[in-house]
Amino acid sequence: MEPSTNKPDCKKIFDSIASKYDRTNTILSLGMHHFWNRSLIQILGSGYSLLDLCAGTGKVAKRYIAAHPQASVTLVDFSSAMLDIAKQHLPQGSCSFIHSDINQLPLENHSYPLAAMAYGLRNLSDPHKALQEISRVLMPSGKLGILELTPPKKTHPTYSAHKLYLRAVVPWIGKSVSKDPDAYSYLSKSIQQLPKDHDLEDLFSKSGFYIAKKKKLFLGAATIWLLEKQ
């Protein structure tokens, strides 16, 4: 994944759909994103502190605190509108919020044992730089859990149906529920344009990580990678 020079203004997109984001996601994923988020938390394991990147409205953070009540979570997102929603339903004592781009995290070196990024990889303007920055703030042997929506391979039986769903159904639901068809048209395209597995594996390696675990979910519609800092 090379730095993108023609990626739309993702911050503007997510600010515009923030108020309807959770409801629309539930409809689009048929509620499966709740299971996917839970799987990410299970794969990450326990830790006293979690860095939640592309944190959005805080659903991953909320689930992590429920599973690990003694832990603290730092939520980072470039959309202030998304973080404002997260602040409304997360315990302030356990959570802190940072409005920032991942490419330049205002955090000390080696300061977190665990990090999570759900549905954010395909929206990064410079994935290599972002992953290097995450590696910088992770402790030695720190872990990063990435959850992303992924297109099935062309040889997979669900490929045609999945492609039709992304091209036709996702923008239509986005228009009906969020009233912002352009935003969900972009989100649909970003899933279809996600690099192939071997390209992602190469990206992770060049950014200072190795894949400790990989899990496909719901016929390959989503994938979790557990990366460990080299």
Swiss-Prot record:
Classification via PROSITE patterns: SAM_MT_UBIE, UBIE_1
MF terms in GO: demethylmenaquinone methyltransferase activity
Annotated residues for binding of S-adenosyl-L-methionine: 57, 77, 101-102
Top EC category: transferase
GO terms for biological process, alphabetical: menaquinone biosynthetic process; methylation
Catalysed reaction, written as an equation: a 2-demethylmenaquinol + S-adenosyl-L-methionine = a menaquinol + S-adenosyl-L-homocysteine + H(+)
CDD domains: AdoMet_MTases (cd02440)
Family annotation (InterPro entries): SAM-dependent_MTases_sf, UbiE/COQ5_MeTrFase, UbiE/COQ5_MeTrFase_CS
Key word Electron transport present: no
Disulfide bonding pattern of the chain: none
Pfam families: Ubie_methyltran
SUPFAM superfamilies per record: S-adenosyl-L-methionine-dependent methyltransferases
EC number(s) stated in the UniProt entry for this protein: 2.1.1.163
Family, similarity comment: Belongs to the class I-like SAM-binding methyltransferase superfamily. MenG/UbiE family.
Role noted for this protein: Methyltransferase required for the conversion of demethylmenaquinol (DMKH2) to menaquinol (MKH2).
Protein name: Demethylmenaquinone methyltransferase
Organism: Chlamydia pneumoniae (Chlamydophila pneumoniae)
Lineage per the UniProt record: Bacteria, Pseudomonadati, Chlamydiota, Chlamydiia, Chlamydiales
Gene designation: menG
